[in-house]
Amino acid sequence: YLVGKNSKERMSWDIAKQAIDYILDNEQSFQEKSVVWDFIGGEPFLEIELIEKICNYIKIELFKRNHHWFDSYRFSFSTNGLNYHEEKVQSFIKKNIDHLSIGITIDGTELKHDLNRIYKNTGNGSYKDVVRNIPLWLEQFPGDGTKVTISSPDLPYIKESVLHLYNLGIHEVNINCVFEDVWQEGDDSLFEEQLIQLADSIIDNGLYEKNDCSFFSEHLGKPLACKLQNQNWCGAGMMLAVDAAGN
């Protein structure tokens, strides 16, 4: 999704329908009170017509089957925000607004964002095309946060990027470090320096009253409860995932 290294695959309507039918046909195996239909793996709104067809089918089938998930479901999306303003996307949002969760990924300042999030055909950064859609997104989903990714080259921009996102009106900033081996000697010291400077700015300006940053979660550095130590994360072993081929 971020670095565009994977092969392109497109889920067909038939595969999507088979997956939905399997889940709804086996209601006894899925007794959770509610369900989140999460569209992941690429930029979802490139396939807005297929997604709308899928979501319409889900809603109709839940109603026809008198399924216990009827009116207890959510459609979840993580988008790069480039085509958030487009008519078909906005039409879908307005139809489903009460059952939607949408997060736009913006990495911070224009400099930091455009280090990684560029157009493949031109090499130009995408920041300006994303940031123009932030006010509309915040108007429609005021409580949703963004997801930031950091790696070695953009470590110097952590502080200014988080503060920039706060200034845009994004109050929840979740940050993940790249897990791959991209780090350089001395990155740990630079990382620490940026976090200290960011923390000082947040405290000195009282930004903690309305804003959150996952780097400063009160749970970090403390022992985990036994239940948390023995559970999987990111839905592993608990969430059912279906790929483009139906596997």
Feature-to-residue mapping (PLM):
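Canonical Radical SAM [4Fe-4S] cluster-binding loop centered on the CxxxCxxC motif
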Residues: 1-14
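Extended hydrophobic/Leu-rich segments
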Residues: 1-3, 138, 207, 243
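A short acidic, helix-capping loop that chelates divalent metal ions and anchors anionic groups
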Residues: 6, 111-117, 183-185
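Radical SAM/AdoMet-radical enzyme domain recognition
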Residues: 13-40, 47-178
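Short acidic (Asp/Glu) and glycine-rich catalytic loops that position anionic groups and cofactors
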Residues: 177-180, 247
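A C-terminal junction/extension of Radical SAM enzymes
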Residues: 184-247
